[in-house]
Amino acid sequence: MTNPHADRLIAFLISSGISDQRVLDAIYRLPRESFVSQAMMHQAYDNNALPIGQGQTISQPYIVAKMTELLDLKSDSNVLEIGTGSGYQTAVLAQIVDHVYSVERIKSLQWDAKRRLKQLDIYNVSTKHGDGWLGWEAKGPFDAIIVTAAAESVPQALLSQLKEGGKMIIPVGEEEQQLLKIERQGEQYLSTVVEMVRFVPLVAGDLA
């Protein structure tokens, strides 16, 4: 069954330069309305960030697609997501790789995301309630790390959990941020500015 809203979104993403078919297919298959409140459902397929409670947002689809594409994922990539949020970005990743590890500092958001993923029969995800600044060392090192909140500086713990040749996509800055692509080469980390973005802040610590 076709979804005209999803068709329009995919056409917009392609016109915006997204070309990885796996990313486009993952976004097309996912019912974005399942990740927002009932009051926001009519905007689910718009290219906008939407509030999900607790001062957090679900990122605009273009940013989800762009960040995912930049990771250059393979099916066996070991992936860490910092900031589970609604679980939408998590679900996109889970359709491309065998397993996703995701850390969320707000307990209620973590539980809501787990429930949504289960309802959509997405089981190849492990979530953890914890401090995103610290990553998830026990499950590393990672081929890819995606950070869905803005850090004032790149957390050292996340750099150390990146595999040789691994990539991290992270927004860095205060009000307006640079979206950085960081690649590990030995003990060097090569950083490229992708574009300017706006994300909620990556807050240290966890919240019950």
UniProtKB/Swiss-Prot annotation:
Catalytic activity reads: [protein]-L-isoaspartate + S-adenosyl-L-methionine = [protein]-L-isoaspartate alpha-methyl ester + S-adenosyl-L-homocysteine
GO molecular function ontology, one term from the record: protein-L-isoaspartate (D-aspartate) O-methyltransferase activity
Under which name does UniProt file this protein? Protein-L-isoaspartate O-methyltransferase
**What's a GO cellular component annotated to this UniProt protein?**
cytoplasm
Give the PANTHER family listed for this entry. PROTEIN-L-ISOASPARTATE O-METHYLTRANSFERASE (PTHR11579), PROTEIN-L-ISOASPARTATE(D-ASPARTATE) O-METHYLTRANSFERASE (PTHR11579:SF0)
What single Pfam family name could you report for this chain, choosing any that match?
PCMT
> Its domain of life?
Bacteria
GO biological processes: methylation; protein modification process; protein repair
Keywords assigned:
Cytoplasm, Methyltransferase, S-adenosyl-L-methionine, Transferase
SUPFAM superfamilies cross-referenced by the UniProt entry = S-adenosyl-L-methionine-dependent methyltransferases
Organism of provenance: Vibrio campbellii (strain ATCC BAA-1116)
Give the main EC class.
Answer: transferase
E.C. number(s) listed in UniProt: 2.1.1.77
Q: Which cysteines are joined by disulfide bonds?
A: none
**Annotated family:** Belongs to the methyltransferase superfamily. L-isoaspartyl/D-aspartyl protein methyltransferase family.
Give compartment(s). Cytoplasm
Q: Which InterPro entries match?
A: PCMT, SAM-dependent_MTases_sf
HAMAP family with a match to the protein in the record = PIMT (MF_00090)
Residue positions of the active site: S59
Q: Which gene encodes it?
A: pcm
The entry's function note states: Catalyzes the methyl esterification of L-isoaspartyl residues in peptides and proteins that result from spontaneous decomposition of normal L-aspartyl and L-asparaginyl residues. It plays a role in the repair and/or degradation of damaged proteins.
